[in-house]
C-alpha cells in the first residue's frame, strides 16, 4: 500500500512534469512564430503591411507618398533587362511606400558602343506623364526638382555577389522599410553594383502592371509605324505580283521572327545548354525555317519581318543569308532589304533601335521568338496581356486570337511546328522571362 506521503510526492511530480511540458510547448510555438515571421514568403507581406500603415498620409497620391522618395543608380544592360530592372526599382519603391525619382537608362550595352555608353533620361524613351496616369495608385515617378531638400538623403547600400541571396536581399529591404529613423529621410538613395538586375521578389502580374504603364514616346512610336508601313507595302507589292493566285482578301499579314542565330548568341546558348543539361535553347537556321513554315493558318502571301542582329545583315553568301531558304508564299524582309536600316534605325543609339524593333514585333499579326530570349519573352508577355483583355486566356487552338505567339526553339504538337506560347500570369516570379524556360505553354494560367 502506498503511503500518503508518496502519493503527495507523485502528484507534485506529475504537476512538475506537466508544467515543464507546457513550458517546452510554449517555447516551441514562440520559435515557430519567430521563424515564420522571417520567412521569405512573409517578409514581403510584412513590408506591405508597413507600407499600408502610411496609406493615410496626407502627402500621398492614391496611397503612394509624394513627399518621400527613392533614388536608384543608372540602369544598365540591354533594353529589355533595363525594363525589368526599372520595374523592380518601381516595385521596391512601392514596397517602401515611396515615389521613385526618375532614373537614367543607358543608351547602349556596356560591352558594345562604349563611346555611346551615356545616361539617357527615362522620359526620352517612355512617356513620363502617361506612366503616372496609367500606374496611378500602384507606383509613381517624380522628377528630382520635386525634392525639397537634396541634403536630406540616406544612402542605403544593396549588396551583390553570390552571398547576397534573394532572401537576404528581401530581408534587407524589409528591415529598411520598417526602420523609422531611415524612413524620416526625404530621400533614400540605393547604392550598389546594378542593384536591380538580379534579385526578384514579385509575381509576374506586378511586373506586367508596370510594363503596361511604359508607353514609348511619340518619336519612337512614329518610327515603328514607318517600319510597319514599309512591311505592309512590301506585302501589297507581293500580292500584286500574284494577282489571282492570292487567297487573302484583307491586308497581307506579317509575321515577326526574332531570329537568334548570330555567333555570340550561339556561343552563349551552347554553354547554357551544357549548364542546364537541356537541348532546346539553340535553334539552327534550318530548324527556324522549317518550324515557322509549318505554322497553321498562314495565308499566301505572308510577309516575314526578321528581327536579327546587324552582323547577320552583312552575309555575302546567299546560302548563309537569313533571307534564303524560306518556303514558297513566305516573303522575308529585314531592316536592310526594307530600306530602313540607315534611314530609320541608323539615326539612333542601340537602346532606341531595340525599342523600335520591339514595337514592330509587338504589332505583328503573329510573333515567333526564342523562349530563352528576354526580348522575345517580354514581347510575348505584352501580347498575352492584350489577348487576355480580348477574352483569350489560351492559344491552344486556332481561332480569333489576333495576338498569337510561338517559340521556335520548342517543338509544338509535333516536331515540325513551333510551340504555341503565352506567358503564365500566375507565376510567383519573373524567372521564366528573365532567364528563359523550356516549360512554356499555350495557356496564360
Swiss-Prot record:
Membrane topology: Single-pass type II membrane protein
EC number: 2.4.1.-
Gene Ontology cellular-component annotations: Golgi membrane
Pathway named in the protein's UniProt entry: Glycan metabolism
Binding positions for substrate per the UniProt entry: 258-260, 374-375
Major localization listed first in the record, in broad terms: Golgi
Assigned keywords, A-Z: Carbohydrate metabolism, Fucose metabolism, Glycoprotein, Glycosyltransferase, Golgi apparatus, Membrane, Signal-anchor, Transferase, Transmembrane, Transmembrane helix
Phenotype of the disrupted gene, per the record: Altered silique morphology and reduced seed set.
Effect of residue 54 to A: Unable to complement the mutant reduced seed set phenotype
Keyword Cell inner membrane appears in the UniProt entry: no
Intracellular or extracellular location(s): Golgi apparatus membrane
Gene Ontology molecular function: any one: glycosyltransferase activity
GO biological process: fucose metabolic process; pollen-pistil interaction; pollination
Function in brief: Probable protein O-fucosyltransferase required for correct pollen tube penetration through the stigma-style interface. May be involved in protein O-glycosylation events during pollen-pistil interactions.
Record family assignment: Belongs to the glycosyltransferase GT106 family.
Protein name: O-fucosyltransferase 23
Organism listed in the record: Arabidopsis thaliana
Taxon lineage: Eukaryota, Viridiplantae, Streptophyta, Embryophyta, Tracheophyta
Amino acid at each position: 500500500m502506498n503511503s500518503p506521503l508518496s502519493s503527495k510526492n507523485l502528484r507534485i511530480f506529475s504537476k512538475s512534469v506537466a508544467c515543464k511540458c507546457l513550458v517546452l510547448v510554449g517555447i516551441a510555438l514562440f520559435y515557430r512564430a519567430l521563424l515564420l515571421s522571417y520567412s521569405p514568403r512573409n517578409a514581403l507581406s510584412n513590408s506591405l503591411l508597413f507600407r499600408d500603415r502610411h496609406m493615410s498620409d496626407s502627402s500621398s497620391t492614391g496611397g503612394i507618398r509624394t513627399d518621400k522618395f527613392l533614388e536608384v543608380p543608372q540602369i544598365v544592360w540591354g533594353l529589355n533587362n533595363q525594363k525589368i530592372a526599372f520595374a523592380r526599382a518601381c516595385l521596391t519603391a512601392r514596397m517602401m511606400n515611396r515615389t521613385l525619382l526618375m532614373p537614367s537608362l543607358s543608351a547602349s550595352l556596356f560591352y558594345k558602343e562604349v563611346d555611346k555608353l551615356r545616361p539617357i533620361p527615362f522620359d526620352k524613351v517612355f512617356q513620363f506623364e502617361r506612366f503616372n496616369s496609367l500606374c496611378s495608385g500602384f507606383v509613381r515617378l517624380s522628377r528630382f526638382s520635386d525634392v525639397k531638400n537634396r541634403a536630406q538623403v540616406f544612402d542605403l547600400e544593396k549588396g551583390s555577389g553570390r552571398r547576397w541571396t534573394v532572401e537576404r536581399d528581401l530581408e534587407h529591404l524589409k528591415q529598411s522599410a520598417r526602420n523609422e529613423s531611415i524612413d524620416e529621410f526625404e530621400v533614400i538613395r540605393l547604392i550598389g553594383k546594378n542593384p536591380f538586375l538580379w534579385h526578384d521578389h514579385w509575381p509576374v502580374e506586378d511586373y506586367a502592371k508596370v510594363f503596361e504603364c511604359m508607353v514609348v514616346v511619340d518619336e519612337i512610336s512614329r518610327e515603328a509605324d514607318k517600319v510597319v508601313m514599309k512591311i505592309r507595302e512590301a506585302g501589297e507589292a507581293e500580292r500584286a505580283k500574284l494577282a489571282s493566285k492570292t487567297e487573302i482578301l484583307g491586308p497581307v499579314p506579317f509575321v515577326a521572327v526574332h531570329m537568334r542565330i548570330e555567333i555570340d548568341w550561339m556561343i552563349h546558348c551552347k554553354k547554357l545548354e551544357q549548364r542546364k543539361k537541356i537541348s532546346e535553347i539553340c535553334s539552327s537556321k534550318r530548324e527556324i525555317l522549317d518550324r515557322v513554315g509549318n505554322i497553321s493558318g498562314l495565308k499566301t502571301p505572308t510577309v516575314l519581318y526578321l528581327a536579327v542582329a546587324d552582323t547577320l545583315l552583312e552575309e555575302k553568301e546567299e546560302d548563309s543569308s537569313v533571307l534564303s531558304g524560306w518556303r514558297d508564299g513566305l516573303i522575308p524582309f529585314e531592316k536592310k532589304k526594307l530600306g530602313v536600316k540607315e534611314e530609320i534605325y541608323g539615326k539612333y543609339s542601340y537602346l532606341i533601335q531595340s525599342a523600335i524593333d520591339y514595337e514592330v514585333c509587338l504589332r505583328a499579326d503573329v510573333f515567333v521568338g526564342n523562349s530563352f530570349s528576354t526580348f522575345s519573352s517580354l514581347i510575348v508577355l505584352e501580347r498575352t496581356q492584350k489577348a487576355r483583355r480580348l477574352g483569350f486566356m489560351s492559344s491552344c487552338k486556332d481561332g480569333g486570337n489576333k495576338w498569337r505567339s510561338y517559340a521556335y526553339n520548342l517543338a509544338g504538337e509535333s516536331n515540325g511546328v513551333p510551340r504555341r506560347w503565352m506567358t503564365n500570369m500566375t507565376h510567383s516570379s519573373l524567372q521564366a522571362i528573365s532567364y528563359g524556360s523550356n516549360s512554356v505553354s499555350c495557356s496564360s494560367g
